[in-house]
């Protein structure tokens, strides 16, 4: 049983699967699925499509240059059957596969090494710009403390009469915000009911 590789995306083509196109110079092109066959007919470049092995190797996302990959090359030279040779090749195949998997894992770890710092910095920047993403109650308390501190500064300048007016206006604004939130929630519920079948 021979498992071919797709001419377009390099994924395995198992017996009884896929499509084979034979050109008039007798060159065979095997495809794993109609997606690859259509892309080939449209003369698309596999190196420009992110889901192909060719792109991943060209972009440095997968191990491309390695001695273990040379064993997978197809050889059309007939060899006389030898029982010992078959045994050694079968043992070598399993060993080569283990080595290749180890090297691929090491390559992936090496490629992902600097990502933790980048992710941390990106998340930190996001939290600094949007503190609401953290616990809502803590953010609200901080804002109230800031308002109170700002109110104390203004009181020193304007006096006690202004303080009462500010408190009243703050209470009114908070009530308005709560009413707006209730209205928005009600609207969402109504729209959800309309959409449901």
Curated annotation (Swiss-Prot):
Q: Where in the cell is it found?
A: Cytoplasm; Nucleus
Chain's gene name: RLP24
Species for this entry: Eremothecium gossypii (strain ATCC 10895 / CBS 109.51 / FGSC 9923 / NRRL Y-1056)
What Pfam families does the record tag this protein with?
Ribosomal_L24e (PF01246)
What is the phylogenetic placement of the source species in the record?
Answer: Eukaryota, Fungi, Dikarya, Ascomycota, Saccharomycotina
Q: Does the keyword Nucleus apply?
A: yes
Q: Spell out the protein name for this chain.
A: Ribosome biogenesis protein RLP24
Q: Which UniProt keywords apply?
A: Cytoplasm, Nucleus, Ribosome biogenesis
Report biased composition (Basic residues) as residue ranges: 185-197
| Subunit-structure text | Associated with nucleolar and cytoplasmic pre-60S particles. At the end of biogenesis it dissociates from cytoplasmic pre-60S particles and is likely to be exchanged for its ribosomal homolog, RPL24.
What role is this protein assigned?
Involved in the biogenesis of the 60S ribosomal subunit. Ensures the docking of NOG1 to pre-60S particles. Activates and recruits ATPase AFG2 to cytoplasmic pre-60S ribosomal particles.
From which domain of life does this come? Eukaryota
Region described as Disordered: spans on this chain: 144-197
Q: Which PROSITE patterns match?
A: RIBOSOMAL_L24E
């Amino acid at each position: 049983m021979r498992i071919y590789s797709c001419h377009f995306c390099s994924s395995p083509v198992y017996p009884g699967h896929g499509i084979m196109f034979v050109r008039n110079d007798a060159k065979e092109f095997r495809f794993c699925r109609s997606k690859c066959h259509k892309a080939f007919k449209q003369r698309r470049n596999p190196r420009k499509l992110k889901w192909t092995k060719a792109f991943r190797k060209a972009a440095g996302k997968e191990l491309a240059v390695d001695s273990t990959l040379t064993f997978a090359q197809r050889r059309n030279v007939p060899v006389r059957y030898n029982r010992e040779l078959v045994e050694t090749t079968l043992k070598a195949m399993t060993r080569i596969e283990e080595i290749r998997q180890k090297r691929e894992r090491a390559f992936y770890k090496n490629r992902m090494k600097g990502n933790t710092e980048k992710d941390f910095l990106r998340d930190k920047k996001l939290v600094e710009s949007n503190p609401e993403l953290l616990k809502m109650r803590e953010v609200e308390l901080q804002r109230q403390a800031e308002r109170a501190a700002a109110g104390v500064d203004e009181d020193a300048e304007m006096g006690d009469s202004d303080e009462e007016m500010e408190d009243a206006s703050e209470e009114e604004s908070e009530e308005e915000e709560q009413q707006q939130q209730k209205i928005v929630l009600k609207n969402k519920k109504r729209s959800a009911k309309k959409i449901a079948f």
